[in-house]
């Protein structure tokens, strides 16, 4: 849920009309006075807006579930769409959590196009799936929190040109693993899904194979 929230468009004012956006938070609006390279102050304000939007949706979800419960429909569900979910400033400003990725690009393509499209991770939600995977305060799908409980050997692979998961995510996950039998390897020049990079995909697979052999797991 942390990563999802980092991608959430903080400019959306009305969930029922995502065309209504706050211009000074809309990173894709040319009229936004805040343009790359972004100031630390803007990033702080924007991150707060993303969390605020997440919590606003969570409050609506909780109200909806309570409404059903009062009517005697405790198991009732309700589907909805989370609009504009690919608006992380780091897609436009590669100086944020820098690596070798190119600007104005993300792991799904041109970020503005993806943000306005019906595609994307976890766009289609039920009330309970929102609480499970999206909610900033209720979701338990949290890699950093769960990693400390891992007891088996771990290999973490990062890609140096990753256009989806930036270095802090990889490093933080590795550091969160609560034991010493862990290793962090990097695939130089690799993007998130190894698109157009079969040699990088093979390198990653061979890295996994070698580690599994070292651990006597195969």
Model regions and ranges:
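Alpha/beta-hydrolase-fold enzymes
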Residues: 2-107
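Conserved alpha/beta-hydrolase "acid-adjacent" motif
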Residues: 3-4, 83, 109, 139, ...
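Short alpha-helix in the alpha/beta-hydrolase fold that links the catalytic acid
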Residues: 4-10, 142-143, 152, 166-175
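Active-site nucleophile elbow and catalytic-triad environment of alpha/beta-hydrolase enzymes
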Residues: 128-146
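Acidic catalytic loop of the alpha/beta-hydrolase fold
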Residues: 137, 160-165, 193-194
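Short beta-strand/loop motif that positions the catalytic acidic residue
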Residues: 149-151, 155-158, 162
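Catalytic histidine-centered segment of alpha/beta-hydrolase-like enzymes
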Residues: 190-203
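C-terminal alpha-helix
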Residues: 207-218
């Amino acid at each position: 849920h942390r990563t999802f929230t980092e991608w959430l468009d903080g400019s959306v004012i009305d969930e029922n009309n995502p065309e209504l956006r706050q211009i000074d938070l809309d990173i894709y609006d040319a009229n936004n006075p805040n343009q790359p390279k972004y100031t630390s102050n803007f990033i702080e304000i924007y991150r707060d807006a993303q969390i605020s939007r997440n919590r606003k949706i969570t409050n609506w979800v909780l109200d909806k579930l309570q409404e059903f419960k009062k009517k005697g429909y405790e198991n009732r569900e309700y589907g909805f769409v989370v609009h504009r979910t690919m608006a992380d400033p780091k897609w436009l400003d590669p100086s944020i959590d820098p690596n070798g990725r190119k600007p104005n690009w993300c792991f799904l393509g041109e970020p503005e196009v993806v943000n306005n499209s019906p595609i994307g991770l976890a766009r289609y939600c039920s009330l309970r799936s929102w609480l499970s995977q999206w909610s900033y305060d209720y979701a338990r799908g949290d890699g950093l929190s769960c990693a400390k409980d891992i007891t088996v050997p771990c290999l973490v692979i990062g890609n140096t040109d990753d256009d989806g998961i930036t270095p802090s995510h990889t490093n933080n996950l590795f550091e969160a693993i609560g034991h010493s039998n862990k290793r962090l390897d990097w695939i130089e020049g690799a993007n998130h899904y190894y698109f157009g990079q079969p040699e990088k995909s093979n390198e990653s697979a061979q890295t996994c194979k070698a580690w599994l052999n070292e651990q006597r797991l195969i």
